[in-house]
Amino acid sequence: MIPNITQLKTAALVMLFAGQALSGPVESRQASESIDAKFKAHGKKYLGNIADQGTLNGNPKTPAIIKANFGQLSPENSMKWDATEPSQGQFSFAGSDYFVEFAETNGKLIRGHTLVWHSQLPSWVSSITDKTTLTDVMKNHITTVMKQYKGKVYAWDVVNEIFEEDGTLRDSVFSRVLGEDFVRIAFETAREADPEAKLYINDYNLDSATSAKLQGMVSHVKKWIAAGVPIDGIGSQTHLGAGAGAAASGALNALASAGTEEVAVTELDIAGASSTDYVDVVNACLDQPKCVGITVWGVADPDSWRADESPLLFDASYNPKEAYNVSQLLSRQHAFDLYLKLGNLLLSRLHSD
């Protein structure tokens, strides 16, 4: 029996990626050209990762892999409110300064993460009940943190995870005290603090075009933009379960319809890290003109917040997985051409037999 084209493609891909994995050195770079460079060659701005002082000073393979493979960095924790302003008016930038210095020294684009978030929030903020006080506190925090790195950060996640699963605003100190006006306050303050930075709203579970949460995000962002709120981009965290990559294209297209200049995949990890899922997400960004880049949320599985799900591109020994080698292809057309050629060879062999 002659196999169908799907079987041929699968067989060819296995052959192709197995060959790549065996041919590359198991060191900082697993290919002659970084995956960031390949992504940029397709017109995108970056393919990045995360870092902080702890991970950079842990396994030495982590900074080596970052330097060789990724073009952008986000701080995992060092720019969050509890790290930068643990006590009111007392700012601490030791961790974030370390992160920024590493990124700048190694020529990495920086995404700031995150300014206003209900989690990792000091109790002195979450206990505020007065509108004027909370407004002043928000403005001071956003302004101080952003000016610390003015001109150094490409984009900021200004507000993070502000929606419930049904698409309504999450209950938080910000929404309770200020209503949805906290979004306007945050973005207007951020624009004033660094007019050149791209300003993002960022959230998780924006992974299906038909989900209530995604639709709530789109409708709110459209409304806020129409009202003059300076939102430049929507970030989809994209923490996926196994097999969920196929919906990424529709989800990114739906987010792009909100009217922002940009969209981005900001915290990518996928349970099981299958090559199919990673390729689906990469191609979803490549196919959406407004998608500027992808940030993978961690280098190797031991450092992941989902370590037991093995969701990243590098395994527990810091070796590249098949998904890394697949991501090297980046272009769907490139991948199709390669496995079609191999498929034709297989067909010819089968017919000759």
Swiss-Prot record:
Glycans are attached at N4, N325. PANTHER family: ENDO-1,4-BETA-XYLANASE C, GLYCOSYL HYDROLASE. Residues 1-23 form the signal peptide. Gene3D superfamilies: Glycosidases (3.20.20.80). The lineage of its organism: Eukaryota, Fungi, Dikarya, Ascomycota, Pezizomycotina. The active site is at E161 (proton donor), E267 (nucleophile). Pathway: Glycan degradation; xylan degradation. Belongs to the glycosyl hydrolase 10 (cellulase F) family. SUPFAM superfamilies: (Trans)glycosidases. Optimum pH is 5.5. Disulfide bonds join C285-C291. It is found in: Secreted. It comes from the Eukaryota. Residues 50-330 form the GH10 domain. Cold active endo-1,4-beta-xylanase involved in the hydrolysis of xylan, a major structural heterogeneous polysaccharide found in plant biomass representing the second most abundant polysaccharide in the biosphere, after cellulose. It catalyses: Endohydrolysis of (1->4)-beta-D-xylosidic linkages in xylans. One of its GO terms (biological process) is xylan catabolic process. Its EC number is 3.2.1.8. InterPro entries: GH10, GH10_AS, GH10_dom, Glycoside_hydrolase_SF. Optimum temperature is 15 degrees Celsius. One of its GO terms (molecular function) is endo-1,4-beta-xylanase activity. It comes from Penicillium chrysogenum (Penicillium notatum). This is Endo-1,4-beta-xylanase. Changing V153L: In strain: A3969.2. The gene is Xyn. Its main location: secreted.
